[in-house]
């Protein structure tokens, strides 16, 4: 029963996220639901994913540049391997970092 409840909670959470339209509202939303440490972890994961997508730095260079561990980078790399190629392209083009490439 707890598993179904968690799945419903996650679905409801994602539905709520989809209704947020501005960066300011997202900032307030995540300040409510995530601790400072969780937000820092999410920011690190974002930077790792973006660096991996850019494919310009080695994992060691990414670790040094962003102050993250090789294990964190490996987890990000493994997660990217499981992502649909279309979603990966969406991530590349949504960040604004790849517009001139």
Curated annotation (Swiss-Prot):
Residues 59-82 bind DNA. Keywords: Cytoplasm, DNA-binding, Repressor, Transcription, Transcription regulation. Its main location: cytoplasm. It holds the Pfam family Trp_repressor. GO terms for cellular component: cytoplasm. InterPro entries: Trp_repress (IPR000831), Trp_repress_bac (IPR013335), Trp_repressor/repl_initiator (IPR010921), TrpR-like_sf (IPR038116). It is found in: Cytoplasm. One of its GO terms (molecular function) is DNA-binding transcription factor activity. Gene3D superfamilies: TrpR-like. SUPFAM superfamilies: TrpR-like. GO terms for biological process: negative regulation of DNA-templated transcription. This protein is an aporepressor. When complexed with L-tryptophan it binds the operator region of the trp operon and prevents the initiation of transcription. Belongs to the TrpR family. Homodimer. This is Trp operon repressor homolog. The lineage of its organism: Bacteria, Pseudomonadati, Chlamydiota, Chlamydiia, Chlamydiales.
């Amino acid at each position: 029963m707890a598993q179904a409840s968690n799945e419903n909670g996650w679905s409801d959470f994602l539905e709520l996220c989809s209704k947020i339209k501005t960066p300011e509202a997202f900032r307030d939303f995540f300040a409510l639901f995530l601790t400072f440490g969780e937000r820092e972890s999410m920011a690190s994961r974002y930077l790792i994913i973006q660096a991996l997508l850019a494919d310009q730095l080695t994992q060691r260079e990414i670790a040094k540049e962003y102050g993250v561990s090789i294990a964190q980078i490996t987890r990000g790399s493994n997660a990217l391997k499981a992502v649909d190629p279309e979603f990966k392209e969406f991530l590349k083009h949504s960040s604004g970092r790849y517009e001139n490439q």
